[in-house]
Amino acid sequence: MAPSSSSGLTFKLHPLVIVNISDHYTRVKTQLNPPASICASGHGSNNGEAMFQQNPRVYGCVIGVQRGRTVEIFNSFELLYDPSTQTLDRSFLEKKQELYKKVFPDFYILGWYSTGSDAEESDMHIHKALMDINESPVYVLLNPAINHTQKDLPVTIYESELHVIDGIPQLIFAHTSYTIETVEAERISVDHVAHLKPSDGGSAATQLAAHLTGIHSAIKMLNSRIRVLYQNLAAMQKGDKSCDNSVLRQVSSLLRRLPAMESERFQDNFLMEYNDKLLITYLAMITNCSSNMNEMVDKFNTAYDRNTRRGGRTAFM
């Protein structure tokens, strides 16, 4: 197990990076492991058994900004790296870096990413290869294996530290903590991806069940976190655990937000917005009914006028 980092840097990881890595891994795995229907039809069977890899590794760069002691990872892009020869396509990397610089001039290459359960010794080769771009790159590792018992994200961030082992200075990976940072656009995008409909469309009951299951899981996790927090506070009150002023301040800040929802001003604003929404819905229904009524009148006039002309009379409507 890698040791903990002692750099003191604060890392913030945006969900777009996790989505990009997951998408990269899924595409590569699908290409190397085509569906059974494709294999049976003969397409893709010429690649041989060597092409079927259960857990392929993917590689890419992570970009973002560093402000003082805070490193914020915003985005990522793929790399062309050959693990067998340990060669990195420099021209492709420089081209991608130039393109991203035109769109995001403030973003810099902060490190790289890969997939796997743990950092390997061979990962240090690509890590050292990026040190001419960033002297202290970070390594974001995503574990694609599904573990239903794990509650945390399967993402680990490593830093490289110089340690003296057997009298020889060597670079080793040291894992560091991080927090998930999101902006409004990312929250909307991630929520949209999480609620995408299946390819067959699915029934309304299936979509509702999936939505309610997601809400239930979120409430269940919130309840477990609150229970853990309550147990820690009870232990502090009894003296079984030393008081952590930082935790107490965060709990106090959280509790101060709750009475705001019961204030008279909040209720007035809520009722005002609620009535506005009802009024907009009512006006939309009236407009729709008026439009349908006009269409019906036009059709009736057209039909009546046609019948009266056949009889030699003129329509009065």
UniProtKB/Swiss-Prot annotation:
Keyword Metal-binding applies: no
Domain of life: Eukaryota
Effects seen without this gene: No visible phenotype when grown under normal conditions, due to the redundancy with CSN6A. Csn6a and csn6b double mutants are lethal at the seedling stage.
Residues that span the membrane, as ranges: none
Keywords linked to the UniProt accession: Cytoplasm, Developmental protein, Nucleus, Phytochrome signaling pathway, Signalosome
Subcellular location: Cytoplasm; Nucleus
BP term (GO), one: protein catabolic process
Molecular function GO labels: metallopeptidase activity
Cellular component GO terms held in the UniProt record: COP9 signalosome; cytoplasm; nucleus
InterPro entries membership: EIF3F/CSN6-like_C, JAMM/MPN+_dom, MPN, MPN_CSN6
Record keyword Cytoplasm present: yes
SMART domains: JAB_MPN (SM00232)
Domain MPN residue range list: 30-164
Function: Component of the COP9 signalosome complex (CSN), a complex involved in various cellular and developmental processes such as photomorphogenesis and auxin and jasmonate responses. The CSN complex is an essential regulator of the ubiquitin (Ubl) conjugation pathway by mediating the deneddylation of the cullin subunits of SCF-type E3 ligase complexes, leading to decrease the Ubl ligase activity of SCF. It is involved in repression of photomorphogenesis in darkness by regulating the activity of COP1-containing Ubl ligase complexes.
Family to which this protein belongs: Belongs to the peptidase M67A family. CSN6 subfamily.
Record's subunit section: Component of the CSN complex, probably composed of CSN1, CSN2, CSN3, CSN4, CSN5 (CSN5A or CSN5B), CSN6 (CSN6A or CSN6B), CSN7 and CSN8. Interacts with itself. In the complex, it probably interacts directly with CSN4 and CSN5A or CSN5B. Interacts with CSN7 (via C-terminal tail). Binds to the translation initiation factors TIF3E1.
Misc note: Although strongly related to metalloprotease proteins, it lacks the JAMM motif that probably constitutes the catalytic center. Its function as protease is therefore unsure.
Protein's name in the database: COP9 signalosome complex subunit 6a
Gene that specifies this protein: CSN6A
